[in-house]
Amino acid sequence: HVSQFGFDSRVVSAVGRDELGEEILKVFNEKKLKMQIEQVDYPTGTVQVTLDDEGVPCYEIKEGVAWDNIPFTDELKRLALSTRAVCFGSLAQRNEVSRATINRFLDTMPDIDGQLKIFDINLRQDFYSKEVLRESFHRCNVLKINDEELVTISRMFGYPGIDLQDKCWILLAKYNLKMLILTCGINGSYVFTPGVVSFQETPKVPVPDT
C-alpha cells in the first residue's frame, strides 16, 4: 500500500529454505515489491484453518517458523539508518529472536523530525505479554489499536474508566504518543492527537452474499 502511494518501502520478514519460501519470493518479485526477506533454517510460516460444527473458522498460527527468527543483518541495519517510518506489531515479537531484531531496528533508526514508529497491535492467541507490549508502547510514537484490543490492554495494565475514549487519552499521555488510532469496526474510527480527537464513520459498502 505504501509503495502504491509512490514511497520507497520495504517488506521485512523471513521465509524458509523450502517450497513455500521460494513461492513467496517469486510472487514478491513478480509484483516488483521491494523486500528485505531473509531465508533461514526454519519452515516458512503457515496458519492452520479448521472449521467447527457450525462452520466457524478457527486459526492456529504455527510456531517455530521463519518469521519467528528474522536476523538483524548488516543490510537490515543500513535499511534502518535510512528509514523514516516503520510499522511493527506484537505478533512478530512472540519469539525473542525477531523481537530483538525489531527492537534493534527501531533503536537504529535516525532521530529526525517527522519520524514515525507505528505500533499496530495484533493480539493473536496467547502470543503477547505485558512486558512486550510495554516495551513497544515506549518505542513507538503512533499506536493503532481496535476496540477489543483496547479492552484487553486496559485490563492488563489496570487503566480506569469505562469510556473507550478515556482509555485512549490515558495511553496517549502516558507514552507521549504523537497519534493514537482507534478502530471500532462498523462503529467507525477515531484519531487522537494531543488535545484533539476526530471521528470517521465506517463507509457503507454493499457486501454480496457468498
Feature map (PLM): residue ranges:
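Structural beta-sheet core signal
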Residues: 11-13, 119, 182
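Beta-barrel outer-membrane channel/assembly domains of diderm bacteria
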Residues: 1-5
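Short, charged, surface-exposed secondary-structure boundary motifs
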Residues: 70, 153-155, 207-210
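Short, hinge-like loop/turn segments at secondary-structure boundaries
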Residues: 27-30, 52-56, 135-137, 160-163, ...
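Conserved N-terminal subdomain of the carbohydrate kinase-like
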Residues: 8-90, 107, 111-115
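Conserved phosphate-binding/catalytic region of the ribokinase-like
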Residues: 161-210
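Conserved beta-alpha-beta core of the PfkB/ribokinase-like small-molecule kinase fold
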Residues: 85, 89-170, 187-189
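Structural alpha-helical scaffold elements that stabilize or flank donor/cofactor-binding regions
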Residues: 78-79, 135-136, 173
